[in-house]
Amino acid sequence: MQVAKSDLYINRKEIVMKYTKKTNTWLDEFERNRPLVIAGPCSAETEEQVLKIAHELKNSDVSIYRAGIWKPRTRPGGFEGVGEIGLKWLQKAKAETGLLMAIEVANVTHVKLALEHDIDVLWIGARTTVNPFAVQEIADALRGTKKIILLKNPVNPDLSLWLGGLERLQNAGIEKIGIVHRGFSTYEKTKYRNIPEWQIAIEMQNRFPDLPIIIDPSHITGNRNMIQEVAQEALDLNYDGMMIETHIDPDNAWSDAAQQVTPSALKQILKDLVVRNSDDNTDEYSKSMAKLRANIDALDSTLLDLLGKRMKIAGQIGQVKKDKNVAILQNNRWNEILEKMVKDGDRKGLSEEFVLKLFKAIHQESIEHQEKVFNK
């Protein structure tokens, strides 16, 4: 899947929103020496189920209890949530356990009902983030709220949509904002339900280092056996917390059964996660890192030089094709290159997924260089 360069590399001067330390003060409200944990069922199914899960999570590292009240299903006919009655179950769960409550809101009616039932955390889902009209209506309905508002990444890998959603929330005077990385839809066959596209989330971190970022390994993996792996990757990238779907009987859950874990499994996952230091100020560490980073910088510069030379040759090839009236795209040649590079990459310890992404990007740039020649 090709991602437009404009989606990933928006000029920083175009970003008008400025986040201050106020953005992450809501994290400081939680007394914790480990990442923030949001957990609970994909869907609130029955009052008994909601309360039982909440009580099993009460004495754990979980601070916020999540449950889907309205479910935006891809196709009609599936379970679409219990609706407003579920909010009363969450009120009862909060009263009995002291956990904060979190739900997804997809429209103004959802927001109104959530606020009426004093839900603590509201998140905007991936299918809503893709629609600027919907996000604006929700932002207007939440204007000036003191609730914690989380924005999931859009379904498609479009950085500008994610940024636009943040801008709309910030412009509505909402200060307690965070983002949730839940992966991106793809037609490609991968081990993930939604591919992480870590570089997009990393770019968000680079632009807004004080903005809390939460990983959602349940939706990224779609597989309970991969949740710890992805959660650990996120912690290694300095994420602030995680949202993990948890159910007392995952295999019989009414929605997304394969990606939910039991409360006991969740506790084991959290126990096994390793929280890294964000930095090390010792002289030995600084000297070692300075040397290694200098090597990386030199190699990166060499890479760019080589790519520049490659594109010049691609332009020359384009001229030959133009002179001989030959089409730019030569599928047989392209497939031969991919096959060879995947094999060479494997011998060098590079994954097939990485090699394919790299050379597809290089190929796209080569085509653009040749198109410029054709259009002269």
Positions of predicted regions on the chain:
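Active-site mouth loops of central-metabolism enzymes
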Residues: 35-52, 76-78, 100-104, 125-126, ...
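Catalytic beta/alpha-barrel core
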Residues: 82, 99-107, 111, 120-135, ...
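Glycine-rich, proline-tolerant flexible connector loops at the mouths of alpha/beta enzymes
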Residues: 66-85, 248-257, 317-328
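Domain-level signature for soluble enzymes in the chorismate/prephenate branch of the shikimate pathway
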Residues: 278-376
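Hydrophobic faces of well-ordered beta-strands that scaffold small-molecule active sites
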Residues: 36-41, 63-67, 101-103, 122-124, ...
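N-terminal small/glycine-rich loop or linker at the start of catalytic domains
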Residues: 24-42, 73-76, 205-215
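N-terminal amphipathic alpha-helix/helix-capping segment at the start of soluble metabolic enzymes
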Residues: 4-38
